[in-house]
């Protein structure tokens, strides 16, 4: 039990350190211009869900379910504003990118698709976050694509870091019941589904890739 508690504290400390990272860009940075801007939103929707994508960080910042109502009989908002955050980190040769500090441009916009583009300061090099909301579905495809960035990334870079946080709203009138049965499910690429504890604080380190 003592060892498990120590592991949990270590994981928590690492998570807090990652969240506290700040990349300071000077005027010579490839992404100096992308670090300046004002927040704007793009809407994706189908018959089941409506999503707001923010150009700040290129992330989904609001999700509303059309077929369900909350306790006030309004469309059910799963998360909004600061309820959820997503930060992708990319290691470069001379500088690093944290997506939550950058302003993306929305291109190739339709009712159900958008590409959030982070332009580098040279040529046509850019980083794309591609969103596609599937028809008649709650599923949102998300693809990260780098174009002309081969000279930016370190040759040793094989992965990106993901810092994802979500504050789960109370949806049911019965708080105790909802808390007891709400869980976070995940799937390692070469294994079956697993989940964190529903009834207590739980943290796990995942050295393998997740689907």
Language-model segments: which ranges?
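Soluble non-transmembrane domains of integral membrane proteins
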Residues: 34-211
């Amino acid at each position: 039990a003592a060892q498990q508690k120590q592991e949990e504290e270590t994981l928590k400390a690492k998570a807090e350190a990652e969240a506290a990272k700040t990349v300071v860009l000077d005027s010579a940075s490839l992404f100096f211009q992308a670090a300046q801007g004002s927040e704007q939103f793009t809407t994706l929707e189908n018959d089941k869900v409506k999503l707001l994508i923010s150009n700040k960080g290129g992330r989904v910042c609001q999700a509303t379910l059309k077929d369900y109502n909350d306790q006030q009989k309004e469309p059910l908002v799963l998360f909004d504003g600061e309820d959820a955050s997503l930060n992708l980190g990319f290691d470069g040769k001379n500088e690093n990118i944290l997506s939550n500090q950058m302003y993306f441009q929305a291109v190739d916009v339709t009712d159900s698709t958008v590409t959030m583009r982070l332009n580098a300061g040279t040529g046509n090099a850019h980083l794309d976050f591609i969103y596609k909301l599937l028809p008649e579905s709650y599923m949102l495809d998300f693809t990260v694509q780098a174009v002309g960035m081969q000279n930016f990334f370190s040759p040793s870079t094989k992965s990106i870091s993901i810092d994802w946080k979500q504050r789960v709203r109370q949806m049911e009138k019965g708080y105790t019941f909802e808390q007891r049965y709400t869980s976070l499910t995940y799937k390692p690429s070469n294994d079956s589904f697993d989940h964190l504890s529903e009834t207590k604080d739980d943290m796990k380190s995942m050295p393998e890739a997740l689907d």
